Every structure is written in structure tokens, then in C-alpha cells.
Amino acid sequence: MTTQTSAATGSPTQQNNAALADMDSMDRQLLDIIQTGFPLSPRPYAELGQRLGLDEQEVLDRVRGLKARKIIRRLGANFQSAKLGFVSTLCAAKVPQDKMDAFVAEVNAKPGVTHNYLREHDYNIWFTLISPSREETQAILDGITQATGVPILNLPATKLFKIRVDFRMDNDS
């Protein structure tokens, strides 16, 4: 949950900039494509390879390398949960340092948690939760509070303004 930094490794921003600088044009093109147009086919990596002039194994190796370097954190579908009948909420909690690990573990164990962030603020943990109903959301949050002793501020979404972001990696594509 927390980010460790040392003088030897640099700040997280410096680490990210170094990782981006190490990517070649092909990695950048691959990232551009898989963010918005990952093929839904029996052999998606072969299809990506055809678009990029690579073979299937080269694409797989590049994706694995990007994951190993933590440039790709997750590769999977994103669903519009509201269209599937689910509700979402933003949650905040004031978590004392001595309860941090237990609280984070409890939150992260819930399948509906999509993001979980440590912030420098009185409300130092912020996470998003998706569930089938407001009642189930509240039951999940009550369970976390009961298990950890930390109350949670529940801020249900009332209107969606933006749901996606694409990071353009290759200016030539």
C-alpha cells in the first residue's frame, strides 16, 4: 500500500520516468493499442502481432516485460458497472498508523474494491467499492469497520462524469 523510496532508487516519479524512457517505439505502440483496442479473438496476441509486424511470441514477451517492469499493472476488461445494475461509492477513512496494515488488508480482500490509495490527509485512505446494491455496499463497509475498528465515510456516486483515460505513448501512431 505504501511506496518505499530510497536515495539509491529515486522517487516514484523518477522511477516511472526511467521506466518510460527505457521503452522502445514498439512497446509504446503496443501500449497504445492494448489500452483501447485489445482484440477479442481466440489469439489476441497473434492479432496484435499482425498489426505491429511482430509474431505472437514477441508480443507476449513484450507484454510480460512491461508487466515485470510494472509499466502494465493489470490487463483486463473494464465494465460499466452501472449498466450491469451495480452501484459504486468512494470511501474515505482516518486510519491510525498502527491499524494501517490490517485495514488495508481488510479492504483489499473485498472483491468489489477497484482502487485503494494512501493519501497525506486526515482521511488518509481512499478507496472505491462496487457492489450489487447500496444495502450490500453498506454491509461491506460495516464489516470492514467491525473488523478493524475504523469508521468509513461512504460517498456514493450520484452522477458519472468521466470513466476512462488513455495514456498516449507513441506520438507517431
From Swiss-Prot:
EC number: 4.1.1.111
Organism: Desulfovibrio desulfuricans (strain ATCC 27774 / DSM 6949 / MB)
Source lineage: Bacteria, Pseudomonadati, Thermodesulfobacteriota, Desulfovibrionia, Desulfovibrionales
Pathway: Porphyrin-containing compound metabolism; protoheme biosynthesis
Function field: Involved in siroheme-dependent heme b biosynthesis. Catalyzes the decarboxylation of siroheme into didecarboxysiroheme. Siroheme is decarboxylated to monodecarboxysiroheme, which is in turn decarboxylated to didecarboxysiroheme.
The keyword Lyase belongs to this UniProt entry's keyword annotation: yes
Name of the featured protein: Siroheme decarboxylase alpha subunit
Catalytic reactions on record: siroheme + 2 H(+) = 12,18-didecarboxysiroheme + 2 CO2
A Pfam family it matches: AsnC_trans_reg2
Catalytic class of the enzyme: lyase
Keywords: Heme biosynthesis, Lyase
